[in-house]
Each structure stands twice: as structure tokens, then as C-alpha cells.
A protein has these predicted regions:
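Short, aromatic/His-centered strand-loop micro-motif at the edge of beta-sheets
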Residues: 176-197
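Short, solvent-exposed beta-strand-to-loop segments that form ligand-recognition rims
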Residues: 211-230
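Ligand-recognition surfaces built from glycine- and aromatic
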Residues: 224-249
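Secretory/extracellular carbohydrate-interaction modules
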Residues: 105-174
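Short tryptophan-centered beta-strand motifs in secreted/extracellular beta-sheet-rich domains
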Residues: 67, 130-132, 193-203, 207-209
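Ser/Thr-rich, Proline-interspersed low-complexity disordered segments
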Residues: 4, 8-15, 19-64, 249
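Extracellular glycan-recognition surfaces and repeat-rich motifs
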Residues: 73-110, 114
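Extracellular carbohydrate-recognition regions
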Residues: 47-84, 243
Length: 249
């Protein structure tokens, strides 16, 4: 009797296991589909030399930086161009031979819309041209700084094409936090996820701006006579710089 009962129990379990699932359960199983995650876009190498770099033929090279050597970041001075608490200070890093604006410092690492710059050079630099390649992964603001001293500076700023703000190209003077637009151009901005070149030249009271090798604006202003050069963006993250060149006449 015990053996017969065991056989019956075994056959019952086998039938239950082999029986097809109810149609409702099968439909539910069909609905469980894992999403396909697209691969992270890779950043192509920056052209070398950068296409569109503008520099006088007889110029003296002050800086040439490709961020491919140890200590490259230590040659630059990181400055937050607006007052922010210590935990919201901007973070810049060198990754795979590029200078990257990398949001804000740990532990928060949050994006922030405040303005930030990486500066290089001496306070007595007066006449020079700075050029750089840049690649925007997801930021929307880029620029170059000239004659930075004690918080005052000139800036050539470009806004990404698909961003709402207009005009897209501006030469600005910033003195003690007050921004004055010296020249503007309502032309298309730059395209994201491709390498572009930006150039800013200061010579006496003449300020000239170039984008991808084409002149965009020229204006005269005599308020600021000397100071460091630099790279500008916002602490949103995702802005890469490479092939920085600074020359003097």
C-alpha cells in the first residue's frame, strides 16, 4: 500500500510539472522583456592639428597643451566665476588625454549651471591668441577667456545651436561680476558631439573671435590690459577640451 501510494504521488507531481501554464501566465511571461540599453557614444580623437586653429605665422608659442602628459592638470588653475559654497565647487579632470569639465566636487558630484574656468598664464600677459578644440557631450555653453585678473576678464562665448538662448556668439567684458556685451552675432552656434575649434585674440584694444577657422566678430575695448588666458564653460559637465594653443605676436 505504501509503495502504491508513493507511485500515485510521483505520477501526480510529474503531471503538474509537465502541464502547460494557463494562457494568462504565458501572456504575462511574454510581456517581461528587458529593455535594450544603447551603447554609450564614444568620443572620436580630436583632429591633430585642429582644423581651423587661427594663429599668426610669425607668432611665439606660449602654451601648447594636449593633456597627454603626467601633471597636465596641475598646470591649470581652476576658478569658479560665481560665488558657490565649497561643496558646489567645479571639478575638472584629465581623462584619456582631454581636459574634462566634470560637474562638481565629491561627494555630491551634481551638475551646476554656475560658470567655471580653467586658467593658465601670467597676470602680465597682454597680447595673445588662444585656440582650443572642444567637444560637447551635454553642456551647451563654451568659451575662451582672455586677460583674466582679479575676477575681471574678456570672454568669447558660444551657445549650442539647439539651445534656446540667442544670440549664439558673444564677446563680453566681465568686471566685478558685471557682464557687458561688447559684440554679438546671431549666427548658428555649434553642434554637439563633434569636435569644433574656438579662437580668441586680444591685441591692444582689438578683440577678435573665430569659430572653426572663420572670423565671427571684432570689437575694440580698452578696459582690461593684461591677464591670464583660459577655457570657459558651465559646471554642468560633459565638456571636453584638447589641443590648446596660446601664441603671442
Amino acid at each position: 500500500m505504501i509503495i502504491a501510494a508513493s507511485v500515485v504521488l510521483f505520477l501526480t507531481i510529474a503531471l503538474v510539472i509537465s502541464a502547460p501554464a494557463p494562457s494568462g501566465q504565458a501572456e504575462m511571461q511574454d510581456l517581461i522583456v528587458l529593455p535594450t540599453v544603447p551603447p554609450t557614444p564614444t568620443v572620436p580623437p580630436a583632429p591633430s592639428p585642429m582644423i581651423g586653429v587661427v594663429a599668426p605665422q610669425a607668432a611665439t608659442t606660449l602654451v601648447t597643451e594636449q593633456f597627454d602628459t603626467d601633471g597636465a592638470l596641475s598646470r591649470w588653475r581652476i576658478v569658479d566665476l560665481e560665488d558657490v559654497p565649497n561643496e558646489r565647487r567645479s571639478l575638472w579632470t584629465v581623462v584619456e588625454g582631454r581636459l574634462r569639465q566634470d560637474r562638481t566636487v565629491p561627494p555630491l558630484r551634481d551638475p551646476s549651471i554656475h560658470e567655471t574656468a580653467a586658467l593658465i598664464g601670467a597676470a602680465d600677459w597682454s597680447d595673445y591668441t588662444i585656440s582650443a578644440g572642444f567637444y560637447d557631450q551635454d553642456n551647451a555653453n563654451v568659451g575662451l577667456i582672455a586677460r583674466y585678473r582679479d575676477g575681471s576678464y574678456y570672454r568669447y562665448r558660444i551657445i549650442r545651436s539647439d539651445y534656446e538662448d540667442r544670440p549664439k556668439h558673444l564677446i563680453e567684458r566681465v568686471v566685478d561680476g558685471t557682464v557687458t556685451v561688447l559684440a554679438s552675432l546671431d549666427a548658428p552656434g555649434y553642434e554637439a558631439r563633434r569636435w569644433n575649434t574656438i579662437t580668441f585674440s586680444v591685441n591692444g584694444n582689438q578683440l577678435r573671435a573665430f569659430f572653426n577657422g572663420q572670423a565671427t566678430m571684432e570689437v575694440r575695448d580698452a578696459h582690461l590690459s593684461s591677464g591670464s588666458a583660459g577655457l570657459y564653460t558651465r559646471a554642468i559637465g560633459g565638456m571636453l577640451f584638447d589641443h590648446v594653443m596660446i601664441t603671442s605676436p
